[in-house]
Amino acid sequence: MAPTTDRSSLEITDFPDDDFLPATTATVKSYQLNRFTRPLIDYVHNEWQANTKYVSLSGSPDGGADSPRWMQMFLSMVTAPRFRRYTLIYLVLLASCLAGWTLVLSPRLEENQWLEHSLDPQTQEEAGGWFGTNTMPRFEGVTHMRTLDKIFLPAVKAVKGEASSRRLIFIGDVHGCRDELELLLDEVSFDHERDHLIFTGDMISKGPDSPGVVDLARQYAASCVRGNHEDRILLLRHDMATTNTLPAASDGDIPPDLFFGLNSKERALARQLSDEQVQWLDACPVILDVGQIPAMGQVLVVHGGLVPGVALEKQDPSSVMNMLTIDLDTHVPSGKRGGMMWTKLFNKHQSLLYASQKGVVPDPKSKVTTVIYGHDAKTSLSLKTYTKGLDSGCVKGGKLTAMIIEDGGEQKVVQVRCRNYHHNQ
């Protein structure tokens, strides 16, 4: 039997090379290293033990032993990197919430409150009646309202997989840009047999070919409304005919205060239009009643806008052609900016009307009104629930816009880019 070895008596010796050790000797060496060296955990260095980030800030040699326990915990928490990161994140979130409330939510809530107050019947009594509640004066030679023939209306329901049987194509302010108008008609694949064009006013003036735009509209038997620029040119034309200044004459012979101070280009356009073109433009109403369209209710076309809550026959023609803003107390419209946009008040009025009809009538949408308009090039294309603004500043290098309504009331918008003719004015 092989002699046994007392392993506890072995000492660590230097061996030249483990490869030359017998197996039993190597085993003994490994054992000796594990037995007499320090445990591996003693060689682990934890950074937190010596890092100043985790040292108490009390300043006492014993790490703040004299400080209250709660203060030590507070100081340790504040000096922790994670606490500082979370604090920064929460401060950013708080600042974002305050900014959102101050800049977005609070102004909208305040505006909504003012709109509801403006439409309150008690406000009407306090103001002594809203603008337009009394019958407005009629303008001689101006067609106030006209109704579109129902044969032009799209079908109430669309047939899946089939092309629309009828389309209404509403076109924003053209301002004499005939080339862009023809391009837009190509873009929408205009078909005279099934499509009907409706212009939202300001077909003429400013651009290079106003008579050409009128001829194109007449060629396709389009419908239109009277815009503020048609109104100016037509009034000028009729005054010229009355004062025998219609034939080409030297502007030097015309008093400077005659014809509302209109410039020479407008006077030239008034002379340039033919009698047939003037007659066609004169027939354009201030308000066009398109009729009932699914999901849109009663659709009206005007150039400027409408005062909500006032019957169509009592709307002021001049305001309908020129309005941009509206006074919330008296509902007096204005052609200047800086006040409440008439579209906001109109949309609020219609939304309240729709809410009042829900559950009362089978189709509450049929009781509301949607207005399609032009005139507001600064706001450009503006498609709200009950107002659709189509003037996108074509004559100044913007776009010419067409809004297409197909069977079932489906809507889509098509635009083409325009050259800038503003520098020629």
Predicted regions and their residues:
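Divalent metal-coordination and catalytic microenvironments
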Residues: 173, 202, 217, 227-228, ...
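Acidic, His/Gly-rich catalytic cores of divalent-metal-dependent hydrolytic chemistry
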Residues: 2-145, 317-425
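Active-site-proximal beta-strand elements of phosphoester/diester hydrolases
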Residues: 167-173, 299-305, 388-390
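Short, basic, glycine/proline-bearing loop/turn elements
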Residues: 196-201, 260-264, 339-344
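N-terminal active-site segment of His-dependent metallophosphoesterases
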Residues: 114-212
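Active-site environment of divalent metal-dependent phosphoester hydrolases
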Residues: 175-179, 205-208, 231-234, 308-309, ...
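Beta-strand-turn-beta hairpins that frame and shape the catalytic cleft
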Residues: 162-168, 290-300, 384
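Active-site neighborhood of divalent metal-dependent phosphoester bond hydrolases
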Residues: 210-300, 304-336
